[in-house]
Amino acid sequence: MFIYAIGTETRQKIGISKNPHKRLKQLQTGNAEQLVLHHMIEVHDDRTRLLERFLHKDIGYKKLKGEWFNLTKQEAKDYLTFAEITWVNDPLLSLKL
């Protein structure tokens, strides 16, 4: 499973998918703005939803609606890279929710 950042220059959807490229096509359907897969990290299946919930909570102050956040593509890439280094294998992640 992957956690991805798909969006525009200034708005990002942070979500999970087995196939982020397919998910991009699904999200693009009916969306007037051109969406791009900006970044993705691979996460063990048993930790994917936990990490996604944690990320959504951690950047909740930038939330727009649903899983969409007020993040530039570079902020999203930097954030997911940081998450991969810091939290993907953190055994105490569930305690941080």
Model-derived features with residue positions:
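Non-catalytic accessory segments flanking enzymatic or RNA/DNA-binding domains
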Residues: M1-L97
